[in-house]
Structures are given as structure tokens and as C-alpha cells.
Amino acid sequence: MYVLGIEGTAWNLSAAIVNEDDVIIERAATYTPARGGIHPREAAQHHSEHIGPLLREVIQGARDLGIKIDGVAFSQGPGLGPCLRTVATAARVLALKLNVPLVGVNHCIAHIEIGKWKTGARDPAVLYVSGGNSQVLALRRGRYRIFGETLDISVGNMLDKFARSVGLPHPGGPRIEELARNAKEYIPLPYTVKGMDFSFSGLATAAAEAARRYDLEDVCYSLQETAFAMLVEVTERAMAHAEKKEAMLVGGVGANRRLGEMLRLMCEERGARFYLPERRFMGDNGSMIAYTGLVMLKSGVSTPIESSGVRPNYRTDEVEVRWA
């Protein structure tokens, strides 16, 4: 089966075709704001300008390879409403034109599914961290249950917020990681874990204040160590509670090598396995939407046109995972 997937929840517009074995074609066009963070309407305008040429290129690539597309998948949510609507409209038109099933995919679950596909993880506790989300999840009773999540802003949002406050370019995460490697000391910062949930807004504020008094490299290091320790603690608790012997890191912030190191060490100490997808599959990508659409279609799940409205606040635990 060949499925075309379209991702466009925020920054990255991407389209891909996959089958059960591999990614066949993938193309992307990324929105980069002139300054500051993401502007939803500007991002949607970017997507609307690029989605036609992007899809034509992917479809022509399929024709050149003699591939017949069996389904169209799209990111139905969560995400920025204007961006989601642009992608959903294109997906509906394409599914009708090709006369193939349409399937709306939960963006968060797509990160998990492509991670499992590409690493071989079977039943992991999942730390999902990105610019818009920070959650610890595990599959129980046919749904990806949220064991812990942010009480305010995501860890990716927190890193970008701090970066802007100290004049670092967007996206802030990679630059913070780079500066942290040259640190000489740890500066105590607020560590906020409440039960199974975490909070990052106070940490960002405290780090911005610390940057006025300490070397920026030390503040970046301390910010990373504190935030990531919070995430690792909750992931370990979820593994114990859900009795999982595997952990997997997904989402754009998961590309941070230090976070991967901390999770790997925790898993080694627990005698558990740690899985980390290739960097190309950590950020938002069309392949994850296409692959999740494929497993959904093979399990008998599709989305009627009349039910294909976008869901900006689509919760991970709302989805019945029939294919797992």
C-alpha cells in the first residue's frame, strides 16, 4: 500500500509517500519568520503558496516510479488552525481527485508511530517534546494515555522564549545546546515537577534573569540540565507506573543530544531499552503522517469528508489505537 501524507501543523509544510517498508518520496518547505516566533496567518500563507508545487512534485515522483497512491493522510490536529485548514483543504481535494480514502491523523500520534517504525520499539513509554507539546505517554487499553504533561508552556516554547529574551536567533534550542557545551558551572534554577506534570514558564523567567548576572554559557547549560532532568524524572515514573521496559524520545526537541544522553543513562540504570529515531524523523515531517495514515487505513480507519474538519486541540488520548 502507498499512502501520501501531508504535514503542516506549524512551521514545516511537508508531503511524503510511504509504503510498509520505507519512505519513498518526501519534500518540504519550511516557514521562517523574519523576526520573533511563529505568526499563524503568515505560516498559513506560506503553506498555501507552497502546497500546490510541493504536491505536484511528489505526485510526479510517484508517477515516475509507477506508484499508484492508495490513500491520502493529513495532519488533522493539534496545531495552528490556519495552517491546519490549508493542509486539510488540499488533502480533501486530492483524495477526491484520486478517488482514494482520506484519513485524518493526530500529529502527536504520528510522531510516536514513525518513531516505533524506524527504531523497532514495540511498547515504549514515550517522551514527546516539541515547540508545541511536552507529554509523557504510554499505550494502555487501546489508547496512548498521557501520564504527564506541561502545566503551562512546552519545553520547546520555553527554550525559544528564553532565547528571544537574551537575543539568540530562532529557533533557540540548537543555539542553547551549542552554548551549553562551553559551560563551566551549574547555576541553580527552579525545578518544578508536580506529581506527574511539569512546569516551564517560571524556569524561563528565572533563566532570563540569571542571564543578566552570569555567563550565558552557564545559564544555557543550567537551563537545559534543569528542564531535561524534570522530563527524565517524569518519564521514569511513567515507565514504573505503566510497567514499560522501553523508552522512546520523539519530537523536535528530541534532537538535543544532551536530552538523549540523559534518557539513555536512566534506561541503562533501570535495565530498560532506549530508542531514538533518526534526526530527520524527529521534527515535523510528511513521512510520519503518511505512515500513520497507512497503518490506520490497514486497520479499517478512514475519515469521511464531512468529518474531516481540523482539530487544533486534538488530544492524543482521544484516538482509539486499533492498529497497535
UniProtKB/Swiss-Prot annotation:
A Pfam match: TsaD
InterPro entries (UniProt xref): ATPase_NBD, Gcp-like_dom, KAE1/TsaD, Kae1_archaea_euk
GO MF term (any one): N(6)-L-threonylcarbamoyladenine synthase activity
Catalytic activities: L-threonylcarbamoyladenylate + adenosine(37) in tRNA = N(6)-L-threonylcarbamoyladenosine(37) in tRNA + AMP + H(+)
Binding site for substrate: 128-132, 160, 173, 177, 256
Top-level taxonomic group: Archaea
Keyword Transferase included in the entry's annotation: yes
Enzyme Commission no: 2.3.1.234
Cofactor(s) needed: Fe(2+)
Keywords: Acyltransferase, Cytoplasm, Iron, Metal-binding, Transferase, tRNA processing
UniProt keyword Acyltransferase, yes or no: yes
Main location: cytoplasm
Note accompanying the cofactor annotation: Binds 1 Fe(2+) ion per subunit.
Binding site for Fe cation: 107, 111, 128, 284
GO cellular component: cytoplasm; EKC/KEOPS complex
Stored NCBIfam families: arch_KAE1, gcp_kae1, PRK09605.1
Function recorded in the entry: Required for the formation of a threonylcarbamoyl group on adenosine at position 37 (t(6)A37) in tRNAs that read codons beginning with adenine. Is a component of the KEOPS complex that is probably involved in the transfer of the threonylcarbamoyl moiety of threonylcarbamoyl-AMP (TC-AMP) to the N6 group of A37. Kae1 likely plays a direct catalytic role in this reaction, but requires other protein(s) of the complex to fulfill this activity.
Family: Belongs to the KAE1 / TsaD family.
Assembly information from the UniProt record: Monomer. Component of the KEOPS complex that consists of Kae1, Bud32, Cgi121 and Pcc1; the whole complex dimerizes.
Protein's recorded name: tRNA N6-adenosine threonylcarbamoyltransferase
